[in-house]
């Protein structure tokens, strides 16, 4: 789903007073979170270039990072932001719960299909002095 398709769908499902620019900023926020929390921590990044966010007009036809069937997370994130901006806390809680579930489903899928990056390694070194660990032999 593209950024403009997502915004149009949310505007149809939940008419609101928020600008396209604000919604693109929210999409930038959620995809930025996906990049930081998932893509940057795993091998084989699906991105061709560093993530620079979305700008209306320039990125209308840009595909969002989470593919179908996981792209519902964008709808629920935008709806949650709209509800929060309108101070409709009960609706926000519902939308945020639906977003959290959709995001968790996507992260589970991503974690199953991509290897985590190996960051350094653990080296265990045991130096012995007289048959005891150094730490133990330094005690008197």
Predicted regions and their residues:
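Short, hydrophobic/amphipathic alpha-helical patches that form generic packing surfaces
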Residues: 72-84
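Conserved short "hinge" loops at termini or chain/domain junctions
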Residues: 1-63, 101-140
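Short, surface-exposed beta-strand/strand-loop-strand elements in extracellular ectodomains
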Residues: 90, 97-98, 102
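Generic detector of ordered secondary-structure context
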Residues: 22, 70-71, 91
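Short, charged, amphipathic alpha-helical segments
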Residues: 24-25, 93-97
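Short helix-capping/linker segments at secondary-structure and domain boundaries
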Residues: 82-92
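Structural motif
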Residues: 63-73
């Amino acid at each position: 789903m593209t950024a403009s398709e997502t915004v149009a769908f949310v505007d149809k499902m939940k008419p609101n007073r928020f600008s396209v620019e604000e919604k693109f900023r929210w999409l930038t926020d959620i995809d930025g979170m996906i990049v930081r929390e998932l893509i940057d921590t795993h091998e084989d990044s699906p991105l061709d270039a560093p993530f620079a966010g979305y700008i209306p007009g320039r990125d209308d036809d840009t595909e969002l990072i989470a593919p179908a069937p996981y792209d519902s997370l964008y709808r629920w994130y935008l709806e949650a932001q709209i509800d929060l901006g309108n101070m409709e806390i009960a609706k926000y809680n519902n939308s945020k719960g639906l977003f959290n579930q959709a995001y968790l489903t996507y992260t589970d899928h991503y974690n199953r299909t991509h290897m985590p990056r190996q960051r350094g390694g653990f080296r265990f070194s045991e130096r012995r002095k007289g048959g005891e660990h150094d730490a133990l032999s330094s005690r008197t």
